[in-house]
Every structure is written in C-alpha cells, then in structure tokens.
C-alpha cells in the first residue's frame, strides 16, 4: 500500500509541474531590447533582411509601404500568408530591406524571411509554418545557357539531309 501511495504522489508532482509550465514556449532569439526578431530570406537572386517586432501590422519594404513597393495586390496577399496561417495578421510590424533579383524573387525572399522571423518569435508557429511550406527555401534558379545552343535547352534546328 505504501508503495502505491509513493507512486501516486510522484505522478501527482509530475502532473502539477507539467500544468505549471507556460503554454507558449519562450522565444529562441532576440536581437535587441525592443524585442525585434531578425531573419534573412532568399529566393532566386534576391536576399531580404527582415526585422519583426510586436506592433499593429505595418509592413515597410526599403523605406516604402508594402502597397507602394509592390504594385500588384496578389504579391501583398502572398507576403501576408505567414500571418494569415498563424492568425497574427495585426500583431507584428515588419521592416525589411531587399536587394537583387526581380519583383517575384524579392516577394519570395520577403515571404521566406517573415516566416523565419515568426518562427523565431514564437516556436509554437514552427509546425504551422513548416506544414504550409513557408520555412523551406525555394532553391529553383535560372538554368545557365549552354554553348552551341540558343538557350539553356533550346537547340538549333536539326536537318537530316
């Protein structure tokens, strides 16, 4: 009987410890006292440096608002995808600088950077972002042109006779 009581007491202590643990895990990395999270995102030839901080949902790209920087509304919607998946659409401000590549590559780099920064801010988002495929770097780049051909894969017209 005493062994049973000892075992139940141990189990109860373990359960109370588990219940007292915080629900959200503590953030992995912070870069300064103001609570900014930093990440870099890459896509094609574009590299984006992203700073994420708790705020009202403002997004600034190269010192311009997101609507000024990206002309198409579909680009803006895809950049907001990590916030929609994690249900934090108006909880973070984003400041990012992006260089290289074209508009599509820059959009992909910013998306990747925001996803990585969100993952650093709250590790609970990791599974959601991973399932959405936002933490994986899209490694597709332009194939190089080969000599003796017109393009990367296009060849000159072949004649049998």
Curated annotation (Swiss-Prot):
GO terms for cellular component: cytosolic small ribosomal subunit. GO terms for molecular function: RNA binding; structural constituent of ribosome. The keyword Ribonucleoprotein applies. The keyword Plastid does not apply. Coiled coil: none annotated. It comes from the Bacteria. Belongs to the universal ribosomal protein uS9 family. This is Small ribosomal subunit protein uS9. The lineage of its organism: Bacteria, Pseudomonadati, Pseudomonadota, Alphaproteobacteria, Rickettsiales. The gene is rpsI.
